[in-house]
Amino acid sequence: QRLTSLGDDPGGLPHLLFYGPPGAGKKTRVMTLLRQVFGPGAERLRLDKKTFQTPTKRTVEINMISSNYHIEMAPGDAGLNDRFVIQDVIKEMASNKNIANMGSSKDGSGGFFASSSAKNDENEGNKKQKAEYKVVVLCEVDKLTRQAQAALRRTMEKYSSSCRLILICNNPSKVIDPVRSRCLGIRVAAPSHDEVAAVLKTVSRKENITLPDELAINIARASNRNLRRALLMLESCHVTTRDDSPKVLKANTAIPHTDWEKYIAMLAAGIASEQSPKALMAAREKLYELLINCIPAQVILKTLVMELLPKLDDTVKGQVV
């Protein structure tokens, strides 16, 4: 209801900060809001790469998803150069009437979109569009450096008349107060097990897959209330089914887990079984292997703690946490 009221009054739309756990549906709600404000044209998306140049003449390339009315990106992918990316993108959007005129793609088309696509989106959006601004969707804002967040705060003030920012993060405490105070915070809570199971049932019904209620609940629990992960688990169950009827899943169907989760479980078992210099070196090698395969350190440590806790005495659990 809150998002619906914001979409019904596009002229009064403030900067927004969506926060909540992974897989709770933050991005889905953002896209729903954009569609309500700008119409179907906001869902015609294209993926492109944009090149930025830092004051030290270093070139930074960022993947961007765009429509004629908004642009979505994760500035944190630029590392320590994230503040230059934020400043350049918002400044360029504010100076262009249409996002289709921003930058230049590698194929020489002169923008993110072909002109025919831009015209079609404008014609369809005229009936719906009431806003005279563009929207910048910044993902993983809590991973930005302090310098980038300070630059974001200054840019928000300077171009507030022509741009609206929608920020998405998992942990709002890592976003500086000046940025949070300039945004309307919208908390997106993780769905309950029953809600995840209901979504899985809906998806399976649309895909003509028979999903037992027991398996839906098991997937919801195994996903830890992460809806994105639950959908991937459902897909894995369907793909790995070897029966003659792959469209029919059984209640006792095994739920596949990712290789890195199995690897961390092996690491936890090794740590709990033996504490010695040899075991320490083996654990370090496994940690390096996970990091080399681009598993975030925060995810590794959190998963490792959850695997270790059931294997430890109650007197030690507090120290581990």
Where are the predicted features?
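P-loop/Walker A NTP-binding region and its immediately flanking N-terminal helices
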Residues: 1-151, 161-166, 173-181
